[in-house]
């Protein structure tokens, strides 16, 4: 029986460990690897902020914010009182400059394996107020992706839009089944919705409306299919291959004012099938691990082999 555990170290001392679920893909992949059909020479560890329980049907992380190559692998064979245990150990490092609130970790068979450039990626991490119009407030309170998030407010009782110029991204190769996901902080009960816009020019954009989750506090939106984005264009002239600006509109409920903390926005490639790439294992931490900037954390994935 295979048993996987992630072990976290800081300054050489163990600070946490969490057990994993090996996914259905992972079981197939490891079986093929033992049969010599698949390569496992390159690996990567992924870290995220979603706390949804791990299932063997997971195909990706809930909300990944950092991925790093596995530095090396080794074996650990020990005999105690005539009982021998066998394990494979993979190690990776989260460097000093990365900060985040780790609630999930996973391992993939390769660091980067995409059949096209239209893979899962970050679109915005909301860590620099100077990148946005209307001067949102910057704060470290409740930030989970990086050190900071931006607080965007309504214009009193009216909606207010914040815009940021970005390096052009190409959405033309994503399908209607791919998804967007937003990480945000709902500060009060007066939020009606958040509208995300993708501009190719000042008048030409796609938009999608995010209905806020119930309650206040840190939230992850549901998966937003790109079908909902592409079907809502301001004109017929939107160029999906040249999205160069993002807009975030904060809309309060009638007669109220509101504010929202924006933490991260990413796009997930949901339907590009590659039999050699997928989530092998996922672990959800019972207690979140706060990774501070300036401190390196080493992570070990130990796969015990029940021979």
Task: Pin down the residues of each PLM region.
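Small cysteine-rich, disulfide-bonded extracellular modules of the LU/uPAR three-finger superfamily
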Residues: 1-103, 108-121, 130, 141-160, ...
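Preference for bulky hydrophobic residues occupying beta-strand positions
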Residues: 92, 182-184, 196, 248, ...
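Exposed beta-strand face motif in extracellular beta-rich ectodomains
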Residues: 103, 242-246
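Beta-sheet-rich sandwich/jelly-roll-like modules and their strand-loop junctions
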Residues: 119-130, 164-171
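Extracellular ligand-binding interfaces
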Residues: 156-235, 242, 255-261, 266-270
């Amino acid at each position: 029986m295979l048993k996987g555990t992630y072990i976290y170290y800081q300054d050489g001392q163990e600070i946490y460990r969490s057990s994993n679920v090996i996914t259905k893909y992972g079981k197939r992949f490891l079986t093929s690897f033992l049969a010599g059909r698949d390569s496992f020479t390159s690996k990567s560890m992924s870290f995220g902020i979603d706390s949804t329980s791990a299932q063997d049907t997971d195909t990706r992380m809930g909300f990944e914010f950092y991925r790093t190559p596995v530095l090396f692998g080794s074996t650990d064979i020990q005999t105690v009182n005539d009982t021998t245990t066998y394990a494979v150990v993979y190690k990776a490092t989260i460097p000093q400059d990365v900060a985040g609130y780790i609630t999930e970790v996973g391992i993939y068979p390769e660091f980067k394996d995409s059949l096209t450039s239209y893979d899962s990626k970050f679109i915005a991490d909301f860590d620099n107020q100077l990148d946005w119009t209307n001067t949102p407030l910057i704060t470290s309170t409740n930030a989970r992706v990086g050190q900071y998030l931006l607080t965007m407010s309504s214009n009193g009782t009216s909606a207010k839009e914040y815009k940021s110029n970005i390096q052009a991204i190409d959405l033309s190769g994503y399908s209607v089944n791919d998804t967007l996901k937003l990480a945000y902080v709902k500060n009060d009960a007066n939020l009606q919705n958040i509208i995300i816009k993708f501009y190719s020019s000042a008048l030409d954009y796609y938009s999608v409306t995010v209905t806020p989750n119930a309650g206040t506090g840190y939230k992850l939106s549901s998966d937003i299919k790109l079908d909902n984005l592409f079907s809502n264009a301001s004109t017929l002239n939107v160029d999906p291959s040249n999205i160069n600006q993002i807009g975030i509109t904060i809309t309060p409920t009638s007669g109220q004012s509101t504010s929202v903390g924006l933490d991260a926005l990413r796009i997930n490639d949901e339907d590009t099938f590659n039999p050699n790439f997928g989530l092998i294992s996922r672990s959800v931490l019972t207690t979140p691990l706060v990774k501070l900037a300036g401190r390196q954390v080493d992570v070990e994935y130990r796969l015990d082999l029940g021979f």
